[in-house]
């Protein structure tokens, strides 16, 4: 496996999935679907989640998954934390109030059973300073470089 690849993924199983009005203005790819009910959209998201999880596992990659929350429409994109090979992790500040809710104590506890929390930048939210992990940064782990997009989330 490439040094840029991983052998272990963390996925959030969608409890809900809908356009997030709090983040839409900073996400070019997010669009509001009006021709399907929220229930149908959630069913499709859940089916896609299971198909993707199965495809990943069939290729020998370990998947750890936890259930999302109905009040967190973007929960399936867990941009609030990152883990590293040395078993450490960091928690990031999130711009949207409903994205901050994704940092469920139960999920943090689950992660800290395996990873040492070395930095929690949540305190920056009160100062309106945001750094949303993979929603605004791309990590080149081999060359130890981070590429960041110009965004209110970075």
Residues covered by each model-derived region:
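The feature marks the mature, well-folded catalytic cores of soluble enzymes
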Residues: 1-154
């Amino acid at each position: 496996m490439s040094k840029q690849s991983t052998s272990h993924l963390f996925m959030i199983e969608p409890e809900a999935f809908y356009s997030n009005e709090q983040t839409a203005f900073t996400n070019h790819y997010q669009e509001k679907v009006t021709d399907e009910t929220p229930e149908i959209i959630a069913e499709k998201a859940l089916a896609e989640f299971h198909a993707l999880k199965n495809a990943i596992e069939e290729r020998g990659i370990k998947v750890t998954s936890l259930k999302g929350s109905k009040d967190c429409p973007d929960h399936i994109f867990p941009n609030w934390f990152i883990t590293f090979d040395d078993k450490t992790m960091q928690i990031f500040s999130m711009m949207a109030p409903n994205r901050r809710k994704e940092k469920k104590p139960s999920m943090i506890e689950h992660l800290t059973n395996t990873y040492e929390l070395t930095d929690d930048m949540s305190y920056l939210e009160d100062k309106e300073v945001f750094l949303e992990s993979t929603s605004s940064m791309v990590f080149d782990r081999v060359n130890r470089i981070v590429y960041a997009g110009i965004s209110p989330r970075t």
